[in-house]
């Protein structure tokens, strides 16, 4: 069973072999290629010293893990740009291109491409296969243009000047938190779909409890 002290258990998103495989990536890219890609900024500029760069590679799981992350990142980029052309038209203007490029780089270098692939997968399934109503998105995830292009959210952050950095910020390492709303009747169908596809051992329910101090409890009861 999973416990709170266990390391995160992230299921693997099945990338079509026609797109690429880890074995192909190991032949195509050297460790130096990965080192540069994961420690430079989105424009290829060196932004950290060697010690910090090596620590970052280690934090991401070492080169063994980086090949998988890069494969996921490249496939995520394909889906994002495909979605961008549906959202913004075939000719993407410079602002849209730069925003997507920046966001994809942050997602990749923080090690989260697989997470976004899985989220877009079950949201797409909810809409297209399960006939479940999905909310338009709320919280900080609405600030992501990539999430908008993937169909995770339905709010254009560029149009409304929403900040991506409130959602993911490399200077404040934290797991991405995407609030997703499903209709009451369909929520169970989505959960069953995710469990069947990714495995029961990779799916968990989480509940939080809030407590009130004496003064607040009395005040809250008095409102009734």
Name the predicted role of every residue range.
Residues 1-224:
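Phosphodiester-processing cores and adjacent nucleic acid-binding clamps
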């Amino acid at each position: 069973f999973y416990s709170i002290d266990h390391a995160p258990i992230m299921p693997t998103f099945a990338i079509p072999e026609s797109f690429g495989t880890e074995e192909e990536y190991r032949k195509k890219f050297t460790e130096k290629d990965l080192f540069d890609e994961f420690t430079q900024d989105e424009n290829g500029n060196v932004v950290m010293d060697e010690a910090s760069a090596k620590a970052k590679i280690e934090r991401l799981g070492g080169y063994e893990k980086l090949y998988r992350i890069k494969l996921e990142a490249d496939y995520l980029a394909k889906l994002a740009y495909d979605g961008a052309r549906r959202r913004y038209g075939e000719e993407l203007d410079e602002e849209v291109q730069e925003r997507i490029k920046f966001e994809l780089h942050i997602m990749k270098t923080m090690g989260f491409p697989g997470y976004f692939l899985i989220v877009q997968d079950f949201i797409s399934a909810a809409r297209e296969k399960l006939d479940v109503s999905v909310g338009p998105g709320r919280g900080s995830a609405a600030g992501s243009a990539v999430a908008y292009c993937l169909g995770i959210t339905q709010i254009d952050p560029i149009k409304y000047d929403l900040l991506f950095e409130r959602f993911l910020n490399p200077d404040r390492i934290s797991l991405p938190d995407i609030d997703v709303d499903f209709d009451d009747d369909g929520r169970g169908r989505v959960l069953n779909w995710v469990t069947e596809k990714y495995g029961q051992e990779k799916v968990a329910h989480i509940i939080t409890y809030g407590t009130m101090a004496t003064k607040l409890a009395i005040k809250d009861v008095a409102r009734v």
